[in-house]
């Protein structure tokens, strides 16, 4: 991305990152990922409970002191929880999960924690050539290409957060030899 309004810094040292933020005075900072950031003043490896806690605390203090919005990205494990210490979830104002399947172009943004708003909302997006685009009508997307009166199918309304979504349900039933 070539833009005079975007600065990318490849840095894992907390002190160097904070110095760059103070020098550049950005409106928004994105840290990807907090598990790779380390404070050299601590005798623990990056990603440890103490490192994640101290690095997050330093970013929070800088953000609040300078009025900067900070997005802290954390890795998730196979179970879908934020990898490493749970302390990160308790420190931040909002926890969002960006979910998707590598075999489809659709992604869901789901709020798991929000100190300033609802957590029962989702956003559905599609990865396109221009980037992520909102899917304004998920029901239409889920039902597109569905033949009318297809045997063994029906449309069901399910709630995804506070949003009703229409989806196709399929079932095949056959009689068995035992009746």
Label each PLM-derived region with a short phrase.
Residues 1-61, 176:
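Conserved inter-motif catalytic segment of the P-loop NTP-binding fold
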